């Protein structure tokens, strides 16, 4: 058992988040499972009831002010579309750092760690985010997305003045991946590419159709980054059996959003040809 708690904050995707925790537990043994939600959807977890009404602002506040519920040195923070996949790649070296996230290859190496949707955060970092006067005085509008706020906006301050240690890119590449094919196998993942890589067709359909049912975000899923990276993964991994579902799903979009998807794919001609031809 590791000195690590699984932490999830979820108010919309209870069933999918429950499944993601279950998948992670086949690969990793945490000391605690902390669920901050409006519903106690994971029996045996440490349930913290909350009912946010102010969207991402309150969500970020809960994430950065949860130290009182944590009895371990670190948390493994997860979303509904992230989980651990390779127990053999866990190493206690991860716990030498206050923050590890999925690599951002669109950033220079010194700023590339990284995505928060599957991340390790130390209690020290969480307490700093909650209690530091300088951070507290920053306008909340600058704190979203919260992982960019931590890893880009205030990274220098955290590193130099608070001695927060961010994992180097080489370590993060063994920990997780998010938007592109990983250079090697990883302990876990976050996002569409990993879902295509690790779920079979029926599971993928279940996750996406359930997300559409319980969250009014079909437009975001099928026209935004999630679907773009899913199609990229389908193409690269040669999982062509996903193509009928992709066409079915996009057929449910209205004309405006359908053309948004086509525009996104036109940014990469290979993906466009694969998807529409």
Locations of the language-model features?
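Generic structural signal for small/hydrophobic residues in well-ordered secondary structure
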Residues: 33, 80-81, 122
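Alpha-helical junction/boundary sensor with strong preference for TPR arrays
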Residues: 237, 252-257
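N-terminal anchoring/stem segment of glycosyltransferases
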Residues: 1-74, 257
């Amino acid at each position: 058992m590791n000195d690590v708690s699984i932490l999830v904050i979820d108010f919309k995707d209870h069933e999918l988040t429950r499944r993601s925790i279950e998948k992670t537990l086949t690969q990793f043994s945490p000391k605690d499972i902390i669920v901050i939600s409006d519903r106690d959807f994971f029996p045996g977890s440490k349930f913290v009831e909350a009912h946010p009404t102010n969207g991402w602002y309150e969500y970020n506040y809960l994430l950065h002010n949860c130290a009182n519920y944590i009895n371990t040195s670190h948390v493994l923070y997860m979303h509904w579309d992230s989980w651990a996949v390779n127990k053999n790649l866990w190493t206690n070296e991860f716990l030498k750092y206050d923050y590890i996230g999925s690599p951002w290859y669109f950033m220079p190496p010194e700023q590339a760690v990284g995505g928060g949707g599957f991340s390790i955060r130390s209690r020290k970092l969480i307490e700093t985010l909650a209690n530091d006067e300088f951070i507290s005085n920053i306008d909340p509008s600058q704190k979203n997305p919260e992982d960019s706020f931590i890893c880009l906006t205030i990274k220098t301050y955290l590193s130099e003045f608070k001695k927060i240690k961010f994992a180097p890119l080489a370590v993060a590449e063994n920990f997780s991946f998010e938007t592109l094919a990983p250079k090697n196998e990883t302990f876990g993942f976050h996002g569409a590419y990993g879902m295509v890589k690790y779920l079979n067709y029926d599971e993928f359909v279940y996750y996406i159709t359930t997300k559409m049912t319980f969250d009014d975000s079909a437009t975001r899923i099928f026209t935004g980054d999630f679907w773009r990276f899913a199609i990229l993964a389908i193409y690269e991994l040669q999982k062509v059996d996903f193509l009928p579902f992709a066409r079915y799903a996009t057929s449910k979009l209205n004309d405006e959003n359908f053309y948004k998807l086509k525009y996104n794919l036109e940014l990469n001609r290979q993906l466009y040809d694969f998807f529409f031809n």
